[in-house]
Amino acid sequence: MNASPSIIQKQYDHNKGYQRAPEPVDGQLVHHLHDRTEFHKYLGKERFYHDYLKYFQSEIDNKGWQNVLNEYLFARDERADDMLVRLFAGFLHPIIHLGFGVEFQQPAIMAEGLAQAAVHDNWMRPLFVGAEETAAKTPNQQSKTLMDLLNEAKSKPELREAAGSTSSNRIRDGLLAKQAQTMVDIVARYHVKPDEIDVKTAEMTNICAFFTGAAQRPEKDIKMDFYYMHCINCSIFFDKFMHQDWLSPENKVRLLEWKGRNAVTMYASRGSPDLLLDEIRNYKPKIPLKDPSDPWKDIIERVCRFEDDGHGSKLVRALAHGQRICKPYEDRPEFILKHDDWLQLGHMTIDSVEAPDGIHWIRSAGFDSAWKDVPDRKKAQL
């Protein structure tokens, strides 16, 4: 993002207030984590984060980070499958953290990402494992596009009803508690072949950006959904994951399938809102473009200065990246966003978070409750 040292320091100072001191480390416990039974015993318990962190730091030092990631996430054994589920928990925060480590080749950050995954829950297992088992029954079935699956999810009122039945965790306590098989049957129809990895990575990125930006209410000011935003923020790392030579083609396929299935589930969990492409294409930026030769420059500079917890800058960065990797496929119908749609989304993002109403994000865009405090949109003056 080309932020200056002074901006980085300013943003760190802005966010340091909620940083927590690490829990004390139990050296004996860290040693015992080498035993698979002991390793499993402490999973999902936040207070053991620091112990898992020290453990994974040691494992990476001894084995190399590539071998550790393959062993603990992609070995296709009980422990690795469980950790992979946890990596997608917490609305994708563990895999986002791991992604930064892989992108910038930082083993210390990778250890943090693995430790985060270890202390998250595995309640998404029925979705991911159930979808794999269902898909395996029809191995020759052609994949549906992600847009097809969003439309299918929207056509199921029972999914919206399940998601709307709780305000706590709409995936766990709504979709998976009440309509798990319906959700599994939908997402199982998305699958990836090894020779499709690049185009499917781009498609996933395109669709995540589309439903994040297009879930608007025409009578309300532009706002992005907080949960949807994580889907596109995470997508940037899949371009990196898919080009790691230490990761097998089979595991690249699996990782990408899980990400696509997670995206459809996330869309349904927020009430499957209408997706309005015209809201993107007709948007009038608050600050006109200054330099057409470098159209992202002003947006990036503004979001770097904007004081938040980093979500805005992650989103702008992911959108600019999405434009680049989707460009070769823009003539394909499953790629909804084209050309300057990405830049429009960049303007929508920075304008919405800078808005004086102080509402940076909404939560659960498909439900009226998400929009109740958002100002009404001013009508254009003729």
Residue ranges of each PLM-predicted region?
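Mature, well-folded catalytic/scaffold domains that follow N-terminal targeting or propeptide regions
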Residues: 1-382
